[in-house]
Amino acid sequence: MSTLGKAPGALKSVDYEVFGRVQGVCFRMYTEEEARKLGVVGWVKNTSQGTVTGQVQGPEDKVNAMKSWLTKVGSPSSRIDRTNFSNEKEISKLDFSGFSTRY
């Protein structure tokens, strides 16, 4: 087996922050629901700056699908201006057993 490239099913972790009208519009609830549908783990929470922040972990294709959702979809009443992603990296194991809302 080649050590070059990524192993099939490689796990990925990424932090995110979503800007726009994302508080008071059930954004966290919909984020949690979408994460469970996709089978990714992590967390989501509101910030005092009016943004939503969190972390997503899982198979690379599922994390990429969640990144797309956090950038383009959101909750029905939200308005996403931009989403910043940081600390994107490959991981050897998941740090969470599910997806939760933090307060």
Swiss-Prot record:
Residue stretches making up the Acylphosphatase-like domain: 13-103
Catalytic-site annotation from UniProt: R28, N46
GO MF term list: acylphosphatase activity
Acetylation among keywords: yes
UniProt keyword annotation of Acyltransferase present: no
Pfam families: Acylphosphatase
The EC number(s) this enzyme carries: 3.6.1.7
Xref: InterPro entries: Acylphosphatase, Acylphosphatase-like_dom, Acylphosphatase-like_dom_sf, Acylphosphatase_CS
Keywords: Acetylation, Hydrolase
Enzyme class name: hydrolase
Reactions the enzyme catalyzes: an acyl phosphate + H2O = a carboxylate + phosphate + H(+)
Modification N-acetylserine, positions: S2
Free-text function comment from the UniProt entry: Its physiological role is not yet clear.
Family designation: Belongs to the acylphosphatase family.
Name of the molecule in the record: Acylphosphatase-2
The species this protein was found in: Anas platyrhynchos (Mallard)
